Amino acid sequence: MKKFADTVRRLLSIALNLFIVWAEPIALPMSWDWGKEQMFIFYTEDSNILSACICAMVAVGQLVCIFTGRELPRWLHTLKYIATCCLTMTFLTVVFVLGPMYKDGNGWYIMLCTSSMLYHHLLNPLAAIFSFVLLERSPRLPRSTVKWALLPTVLYGGIILWLNIQRVVDGPYPFMKVYDQSVQASVLWCIAILLMNYFYAWLLWKLNGGTKENA
């Protein structure tokens, strides 16, 4: 019975990971039609492309585990954790920051339910969170893993802020427009986003059943 339940869990995990892989070829052309190569300066696009690649690897890994009885390799589980943190960051930034910025009150609907944003801002993040928290609970990740979840955000933020300072790009997010706000505001936004990212990462680690022991 335990083996059957474990197989069902892995099959559900495969299904949700493949959903994210399947959604990306649908969403990317929509984003391309909207912004062409400019779409790649958005954290949303980059994190979803990264996550689709990782989810494809996880789906294959879970299939192998069904036949071998082993758990996912820790490095692969860690990658899925990082991808899930990126998509969670995207989803919650829309919900709590970008959505409310629309003065007409339609921000949440526009950014969660239209065009490629339906997949990139809503469905993909929810699929990643659900699969990681409920279906991919082993091997347990050590507490030290949490800091690695911030790496994509730090890399993206550092590059985009530098490009904004050099006036190569403008934004793409309002809080990254360094010449439209004070230096203090830019610094506070960076601190706030990293703190939010760390909190989301810690919460996902906790919900996944992470261990405090070093590994």
Outline where the language-model segments fall:
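Membrane-helix exit/interface motif
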Residues: 58-68, 89-106, 130-134
